[in-house]
Amino acid sequence: VDILKYVVPELERGIGVVQNQAHRFDVWEHNLRTLQHAADKKWPLHIRLSAVLHDISKPETRRYSKEKGDYTFYGHDVVGGRVSREILERLKFSKDMTDRVSMFVRWHMFFSDTEQITLSAVRRLITNVGKDNIWDLIDLRICDRIGTGRPKEEPYRLRMYQSMVEEALQDPISLKMLKTNGKRIMDVTQETAGPKIGYVLHALFDEV
C-alpha cells in the first residue's frame, strides 16, 4: 500500500469504504479479490486490469439511501470508465489496452441487473463492446461476483447469460438493419449531415 500511492493512488481511496449488503468486503478488498480470481483463472492482462479497476470510482459515487437502508453507487461504472482511462494513460499502457480496459470498466455492471437483461439489450451491448469482447465481459462479471465474498455465481444465471449471448451472436443487429437511415432523418428534420444525425440513429437503435 505504501508504494501504491505513487502508482495508482485512486485504489487507496477504497480502503475502509463499506459497501452494500451484497458485499462482505470494503471496496479495496473487493477489488483485490476480484483481481485474484482473474489471476487464479490465468485470464489475460486486460481482464486482470479490468478486475482491479472495475470499482475504482465507488468511493466518490457512494450515497446512502434512506429508502433502501443501504449504500448505492449509481454511475460508478460510467465514472470508472473515465477514471480507469486516465490511470492507464498515465501509466503509459498502449492505446489498445487502455481502450479495452476502460470499456470493460464502463460496461461491467450490465450483467448485474437480471431484470433488464433482454435479448435486445444483449444485442445492443455486443454492438457497444464488440463481439470479440463479450465473453471477456462475462468473465469479468464472474470475477466481480466471486469478489463479493457472497455465494458464487448461480449456475443457472450464468447459463442464461451465456445462452442469450450465443443467440444474439447468431442473430446480430446493426444500424444498417433499421428501417430508416441518415438521409431520411435529414429529410424529415431538415438537419444537415453531422453528429446529430448519428445521435438520432443510435437513439433509435437503442429502442430496437
Residue ranges and their predicted role:
Residues 1, 11-16, 52-55, 100-108, ...:
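A glycine-rich phosphate-binding loop feature that marks nucleotide/adenosyl-phosphate handling sites
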Residues 1-38:
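Long, charged alpha-helical interface segments
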Residues 2-4, 44, 94, 191-192:
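Short coil/loop linkers at secondary-structure junctions
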Residues 3-6, 109-110, 186-191:
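Core structural elements
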Residues 3-6, 33, 100, 121-124, ...:
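Exposed alpha-helical structural elements
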Residues 10-17, 101-103, 195-206:
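Short linear loop/turn motifs
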Residues 26-29, 33, 37-151:
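Divalent metal-dependent catalytic cores for phosphoryl transfer on phosphate-bearing substrates
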Residues 86, 90, 145-208:
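Charged substrate- and nucleic-acid-binding regions of tRNA-handling and nucleotidyl-transfer enzymes
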